[in-house]
């Protein structure tokens, strides 16, 4: 089945819709005044993207084997110790950090959606090209960050912001979904909690992503990711 076949195109569209929903929910966590909430929800949403993409691609890899793509790498003890060490400083800075997140939401929300979608897109591309070595997951994450930092997403960011303005009450619905996630993490086969308003919002955002100019922009991102990933994998200068 080729990527341009109707069945495969429909699967890609469905998968991208799931990525957008996850990005919308992740972006709304910044509006909840609870310490560590946004980090935890972002991790869960990105884990969902990885799990959904692996399942849709028919991969035998476990979600946990690609943990560097959505959370901190390393063992449970090491991860817990790092979190404990950072907790006091994060609590002290929480009020300032939260104010900044809310004040910059007009930029931060669409950027969070884009990052979530590009995580899924890149993982799907890598799975389509062959087997992924879980040992290179951290290099993949760093290459994603490298490529994203080198892109000019101003026009796309503005278009996504406009699409969100046209969706009423998306923020309240997304916050409710984020709170639901915080109470009970998703099992790997579960869908992201999304009501009709979130579905509508995701559909509006997806129309922006389906534009020809967005496709060209994402192709450029793919090229830059491939370069960064190759450099990260070989240790060559970027």
Q: What name fits each language-model region?
A:
Residues 24-32, 37, 77-84, 88:
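Membrane-active amphipathic alpha-helices enriched in small hydrophobic residues
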Residues 1-26, 44-78, 92-95, 102-238:
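Terminal, membrane-proximal amphipathic helices
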Residues 36-45:
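Transmembrane alpha-helix/helix-exit interface in multi-pass inner-membrane proteins
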């Amino acid at each position: 089945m080729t990527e341009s076949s109707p069945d495969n195109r429909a699967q890609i569209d469905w998968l991208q819709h799931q990525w957008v929903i996850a990005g919308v929910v992740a972006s709304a966590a910044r509006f909840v005044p609870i310490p560590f909430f946004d980090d935890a929800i972002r991790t869960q949403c990105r884990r969902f993207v990885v799990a959904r993409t692996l399942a849709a691609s028919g991969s035998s890899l476990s979600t946990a084997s690609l943990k560097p793509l959505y959370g901190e790498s390393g063992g449970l003890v090491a991860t817990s110790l790092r979190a404990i060490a950072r907790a006091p400083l994060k609590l002290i800075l929480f009020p300032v950090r939260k104010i900044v997140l809310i004040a910059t939401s007009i930029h931060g929300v669409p950027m969070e959606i884009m990052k979530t979608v590009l995580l899924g897109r890149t993982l799907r591309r890598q799975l389509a090209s062959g087997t992924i070595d879980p040992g290179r997951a951290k290099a993949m994450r760093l290459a994603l960050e490298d490529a994203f930092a080198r892109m000019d997403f101003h026009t796309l960011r503005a278009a996504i912001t406009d699409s969100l303005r046209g969706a009423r009450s998306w923020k309240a619905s997304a916050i409710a979904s984020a709170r639901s996630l915080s109470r009970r993490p998703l099992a790997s086969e579960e869908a992201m909690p999304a009501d009709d308003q979130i579905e509508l919002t995701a559909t509006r955002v997806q129309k922006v992503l389906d534009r020809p100019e967005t496709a060209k922009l994402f192709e450029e991102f793919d090229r830059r990711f491939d370069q960064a990933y190759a450099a990260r994998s070989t240790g060559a200068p970027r």
